[in-house]
A protein has these predicted regions:
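Positively charged n-region of N-terminal signal peptides that target proteins for export
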Residues: 1-4
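Glycine-rich portal/gate segments that line the openings of hydrophobic small-molecule binding cavities
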Residues: 53, 57, 63-109, 171
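Short, highly charged C-terminal tails/helix-capping segments
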Residues: 167-180
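Hydrophobic/aromatic beta-strand elements that line small-molecule binding cavities or substrate pockets
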Residues: 33-35, 89-95, 118-126
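Hydrophobic ligand-binding cavity/cleft-lining segments
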Residues: 18-69
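Hydrophobic pocket/interface hotspot
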Residues: 44-47, 78, 93, 104, ...
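Beta-strand/loop substructures that line and gate deep hydrophobic ligand-binding cavities in soluble
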Residues: 109-160
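N-terminal signal peptide c-region/cleavage motif recognized by signal peptidases
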Residues: 14-16
């Protein structure tokens, strides 16, 4: 419970993406997040795989999103460099269809330290005025207290990430505008 409360305090939900914990139980959860961007599918895809340009540095181990990278090829790495020869594999690319979908497997961030496994799919669908991007992350396994305790915080991180990707694609800047 304390772990879930800590994660909830760290993560915030962005209004820039439609987010949903589609399913949640002690043994797993599924989150679905969607946005529509003002770009064609290939441009949206190319921006998405440049994760270091739009991911939030607050949700990295290094504190610097520029150290995040995705190798968009089968068995490619969604990795983070920690300097020198240190680093972490957050997810492994398992399916690549440029402009259409990217599938990754593993435990993103702190989930990689738990007894869980996940499958994340990024889908790119042409719609009127641009591209709909959908992040779906299904996680299963074991966590003391139940995985349902962290479904919301994980969903919030992914919603924020997708909102930042939307801003990056639409404006060139992933940072939300600050209104004084």
């Amino acid at each position: 419970m304390r772990k879930a409360a800590l994660l909830a305090g760290i993560f915030c939900l962005s209004p820039l993406a439609v987010a949903e914990v589609a399913e949640s139980s002690a043994n797993g959860f599924t989150t679905v997040n969607t946005v529509v961007v003002e770009a064609d599918r290939m441009a949206a895809w190319q921006a998405a795989v440049q994760v270091g340009r739009w991911w939030n540095s607050a949700h990295t181990m290094s504190g610097d999103a520029a150290r995040m990278a995705i190798e968009p090829r089968v068995q490619g790495c969604f990795c983070e460099s920690l300097g020198d020869e240190a680093g972490v594999v957050h997810l492994t690319v398992t399916s690549v269809m440029p402009g259409t979908s990217l599938r990754l497997s593993g435990g993103l961030g702190p989930l990689g330290l738990m007894g869980v496994y996940g499958n994340m799919t990024w889908d790119f669908e042409e719609v009127e005025g641009g591209t709909r991007i959908r992040f779906k992350y299904a996680v299963g396994g074991h966590m003391d207290g139940g995985l349902d305790q962290i479904a919301g915080p994980v969903d919030a991180v992914l919603a924020e990430a997708l909102g930042r990707l939307r801003l990056y694609i639409d404006t060139g800047n992933p940072e939300p505008a600050v209104i004084d």
